[in-house]
């Protein structure tokens, strides 16, 4: 057993290193999902709501969309909704547990004002709320992980949703395969159990 493996065995009781290595599997799995059941609409924009790691994808989507999308995409990390929001804005609510208090508050407000919500979670109150709404959809992701380790599932699902709804230009299957391959190769170079870059960098700190 290497020194690095000994450290992991001693301190990484939740197997974050293992979950991190499986990030690309989670991402690839999410990219292969089909969201054809979600109808297109004449949205004025998209508001991504979520907290912490569950909300991080909204930040990335906002940045990506500012360069490539035809609609404005904003994110919200708080209770309720911004004062300018109206039901002509689609709400995409992400909460890994499905029970995040702030996110549930945003969803309840959106539904109460006649809005449409796409929710992404592993279950919880978010799923229950959206099952009761005719204008909303819940998309499930695998549970059983720590929220911070589930970013591949969450962001991959968000991005796939944007592609399927035509909110962002969708890459070809070949482009997706090449992207995943590049990410895996780069990650392996920095994985102390596989490559040497991380160890070499640590020695210079």
Segments from the language model and where they lie:
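Alpha-helix initiation/capping motif
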Residues: 9, 16, 147, 172, ...
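Alpha-helical structural motif
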Residues: 12, 16-19, 23, 154, ...
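Cofactor-/ligand-binding subdomain signature composed of acidic, glycine-rich
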Residues: 1-31
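Compositionally biased, low-hydrophobicity segments enriched in charged and small polar residues
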Residues: 1-3, 130-136, 200-203
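Glycine-rich phosphate-binding loops that contact phosphosugars or nucleotide phosphates
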Residues: 36-37, 41-188
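Short, structured coil/loop segments at alpha-helix boundaries
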Residues: 1-2, 13-17, 100, 104, ...
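Context-gated lysine
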Residues: 10-13, 67, 131, 197
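A short, well-structured juxtamembrane/interface segment
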Residues: 26-42, 191-204
């Amino acid at each position: 057993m290497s020194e690095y493996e000994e450290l992991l065995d001693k301190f990484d009781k939740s197997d974050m290193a293992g979950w991190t290595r499986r990030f690309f599997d989670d991402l690839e799995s999410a990219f292969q999902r089909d969201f054809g059941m979600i109808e297109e609409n004449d949205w004025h924009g998209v508001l991504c709501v979520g907290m912490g790691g569950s909300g991080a994808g909204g930040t990335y989507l906002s940045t990506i969309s500012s360069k490539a999308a035809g609609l404005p995409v904003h994110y919200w990390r708080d209770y309720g909704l911004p004062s300018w929001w109206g039901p002509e804005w689609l709400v995409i609510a992400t909460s890994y547990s499905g029970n995040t208090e702030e996110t549930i508050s945003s969803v309840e407000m959106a539904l109460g004002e006649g809005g449409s919500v796409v929710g992404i979670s592993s279950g919880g109150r978010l799923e229950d709320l959206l099952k009761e709404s005719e204008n909303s959809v819940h998309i499930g992701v695998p549970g059983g992980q720590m929220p911070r380790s589930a970013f591949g599932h969450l962001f991959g699902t968000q991005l796939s949703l944007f592609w399927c709804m035509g909110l962002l230009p969708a890459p070809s299957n070949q482009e997706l395969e090449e992207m995943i391959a590049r990410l895996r190769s780069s990650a392996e170079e920095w994985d102390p159990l596989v490559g040497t870059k991380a160890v070499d960098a640590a020695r210079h700190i």
